[in-house]
């Protein structure tokens, strides 16, 4: 079940300590890769990045002075031997190259290749496997992020629950699995058509908050 609610908030918004924290720490946007930015099941070591329509342009519209941009992705395909780790690394290199050419400053790609039913060394539980918020907590430490003023954009209920557990705003896109995976009951802040609408909606929300 998916419901919509308001926007993210800091405890005590409007108080001097909360406002000081907002100014001293960075806001971030986290995007799942498959089903949000690129087509599902089409990650390969060679060839073009299978961008979803308008996804790269959406990333390019993000003001780097307002948000740091990250990718946080679960890679069960690596865990189950469907994609080699080195091939995923090569894919990420092409992904970052496309972003660089579009002047999109991707700060880091976080990924988790582990699954409790995975193969060999990839078979284990991990705090970085969604819906655990480990990926976001690591980014918070590495980049001094204010997760209470940050957002995650995903296409599964697992993505949304992970964002909620990190205390972030959550935006579900109706591409990829479109929240129909049925893994969890979630209550995203926004439900939108695709990543273009997600970025536009988040930016509108932030402008309204700052006015």
Enumerate the predicted regions with their spans:
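Short, electropositive alpha-helical surface patch
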Residues: 82-101, 122-135, 164-167
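Short helix-capping segments at alpha-helix termini
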Residues: 100-105, 144
């Amino acid at each position: 079940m998916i419901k919509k609610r308001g926007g993210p908030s800091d405890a005590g918004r409007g108080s001097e300590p909360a406002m000081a924290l907002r100014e001293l720490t960075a806001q971030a946007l986290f995007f799942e890769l498959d089903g949000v930015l690129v087509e599902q099941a089409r990650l390969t070591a060679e060839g073009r990045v299978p961008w979803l329509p308008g996804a790269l342009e959406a990333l390019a519209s993000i003001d780097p002075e307002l948000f740091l941009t990250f990718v946080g992705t679960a890679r069960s395909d690596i865990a189950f031997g469907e994609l080699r780790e080195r091939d995923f690394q090569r894919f990420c290199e092409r992904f970052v190259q496309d972003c660089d050419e579009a002047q999109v400053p991707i700060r880091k790609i976080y990924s988790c290749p582990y699954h409790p039913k995975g193969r060999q060394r990839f078979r284990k539980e991990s705090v970085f496997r969604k819906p655990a918020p480990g990926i976001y907590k690591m980014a918070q430490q590495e980049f001094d992020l204010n997760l209470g003023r940050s957002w995650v954009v995903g296409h599964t209920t697992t993505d949304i629950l992970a964002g909620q557990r990190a205390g972030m705003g959550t935006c579900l896109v109706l591409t990829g699995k479109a929240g129909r995976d049925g893994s969890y009951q979630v209550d995203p802040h926004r439900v939108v058509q695709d990543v273009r609408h997600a970025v536009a909606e988040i930016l509108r929300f932030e402008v309204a908050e700052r006015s």
